[in-house]
């Protein structure tokens, strides 16, 4: 399954547009459990805890997007866009939304 942020695939013409596919992934960020990691992450300028949660959420959302496109018998998903939401940093949650257009290639 090809996943692309572009609307077309070079050298692979689109035969049919099958519709919009979307997915979401919610990851917990357990800052409360590891206060020292939070402290280190904050003063270190980068939050490894948050980066890890974002990476995992993006990977899960991508896999779900592929699964939904396969249900439509798609060859690829084009125009993929990821949106990130953090409903509450204190609540320790990150949400990644993925959307794209499922297509069949020639």
Swiss-Prot record:
InterPro entries, per database record: UPF0145_dom_sf (IPR035439), UPF0145_YbjQ-like (IPR002765)
Family the entry assigns: Belongs to the UPF0145 family.
Database matches in PANTHER family: UPF0145 PROTEIN YBJQ
Stored HAMAP family: UPF0145
Protein name: UPF0145 protein PP_2873
Upper classification of the organism: Bacteria, Pseudomonadati, Pseudomonadota, Gammaproteobacteria, Pseudomonadales
């Amino acid at each position: 399954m090809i996943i692309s942020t572009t609307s077309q695939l070079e050298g692979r013409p689109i035969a049919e547009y099958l519709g919009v596919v979307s997915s979401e992934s919610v990851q917990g960020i357990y800052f409360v459990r590891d206060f020292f990691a939070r402290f280190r992450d904050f003063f270190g300028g980068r939050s490894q805890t948050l980066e890890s949660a974002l990476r995992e959420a993006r990977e899960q959302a991508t896999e779900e997007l592929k699964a939904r496109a396969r249900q439509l018998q798609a060859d690829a998903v084009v125009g993929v866009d990821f949106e990130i939401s953090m409903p509450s940093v204190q609540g320790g949650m990150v949400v990644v939304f993925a959307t794209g257009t499922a297509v069949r290639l020639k």
